[in-house]
């Protein structure tokens, strides 16, 4: 089954003729370089958690070539995250495309921000043994408040029943389906956040030192320390450029969320609300 994704779910620049020509050239060159092993970097997380910001921070680095939600990569990744049965159809194309993009990026290292790869990370790690993974986590209240403001992210909670259940991407299971249907949008966004939090926990056990967890609030408040930690993890010779800090985003949720919404979020995530 092919699911119908909403139009323009990707913020990346659409594919152009120049992209197709560039990749065709790489495909021809790689035919004579069968031993080439890419070492891509993948940014993982849920929507509105800071994955975009992390990619923007790394994008100017001279050693990296950064893709941010680039079609058709982002579309493939999102569809597989929502519907695992799509993996047989789409995964081979995704892996080939990553190999071509990584080869085309040389001598720079490919970094891709298609954050739903959080649900595909084990397969990516298996195929690309030198890959590294950046898992991004933001507090539940900031994530939910930002999700409610963002039409494209809010869409998923509003239209969840248009997609297969179970739905790991949204955190909907057969067991919680009926309860989810009765939830507010804030609570549904909290369900999604919790599913991604637990998935990050799972991936840390699976990927070990191939993954680093970046916390949104620490990147805001302990920027130098966190950039150095990320630089060390990625084995970058040059420092990561200093980003613009918008510290008001840490507390904005207190203005955006009502007391009822905060209570609904707490009811969903329980003690996990303290984790960020």
What residues fall within each predicted segment?
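Short catalytic/ligand-binding loop motif for oxyanion handling, primarily in non-cytosolic enzymes
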Residues: 52-55, 74-76, 118-121, 141-146, ...
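Anion-recognition interface
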Residues: 81, 87-97, 107-124, 151-191, ...
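Short, conserved active-site loop motifs that form the nucleotide-linked donor/cofactor pocket
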Residues: 64, 131, 210-211
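PAPS-dependent sulfotransferase catalytic core
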Residues: 1-105, 152-153
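Short beta-strand segments
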Residues: 43-45, 110-113, 135-137, 213-216
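PAPS-dependent sulfotransferases, especially Golgi type II membrane carbohydrate sulfotransferases
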Residues: 1-40, 156-157, 165-276
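Conserved phosphate-donor/acceptor-positioning beta-strand/loop module used by diverse small-molecule
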Residues: 127-148
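Acidic-histidine catalytic/liganding microenvironments
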Residues: 61, 128, 208
